[in-house]
């Protein structure tokens, strides 16, 4: 069998997922002390559930994680636990954030999840380079080719 397989009592498994989720209102809050604190909280909660983090990146307005989730946990139940418990822990550590987010919910409702097969290396590289790609996309969006109000082509200065 392959070395990246895991096993439980009577099960051998290799369940890897690429997960992306964002703070409520997609606020750009994940930087500096918040970034380090949120990273510690997410690692702690994953360890408690036996979820292995292969790669992770905290961008200012979203989180990318490549994780192995045991088959005894469903993705939806694990993510409900991760987002719910981490919200409470984030608000305990950073009480000032309670005023920006109502109802003690730090994360938005949805998430993106994709299974990972033979393309694991490519996804790990994508996650590692995510911050650079966000900066490039922001720079590209500074100049719009067409005026959003008139629809006419803008002239570069």
What is the predicted role of each segment?
Residues 1-157:
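Basic nucleic-acid-binding interfaces
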């Amino acid at each position: 069998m392959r070395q990246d397989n895991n096993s439980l009592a009577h099960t051998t498994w290799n369940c890897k997922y690429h997960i992306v989720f964002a703070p409520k209102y997609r606020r750009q809050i994940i930087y500096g002390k918040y970034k380090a604190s949120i990273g510690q909280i997410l690692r702690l909660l994953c360890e408690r559930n036996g979820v292995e983090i292969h790669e992770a990146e905290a961008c200012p307005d979203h989180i990318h994680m490549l994780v192995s989730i045991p088959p005894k946990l469903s993705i939806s139940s694990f993510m409900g636990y991760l987002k719910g418990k981490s919200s409470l822990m984030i608000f305990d550590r950073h009480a000032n954030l309670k005023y920006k987010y109502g109802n003690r919910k730090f994360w938005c409702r949805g998430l993106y999840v994709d299974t990972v097969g033979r393309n694991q290396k490519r996804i790990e590289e994508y996650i590692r380079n995510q911050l650079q790609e966000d900066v490039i996309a922001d720079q590209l969006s500074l100049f719009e080719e067409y005026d959003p109000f008139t629809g006419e082509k803008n002239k570069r200065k």
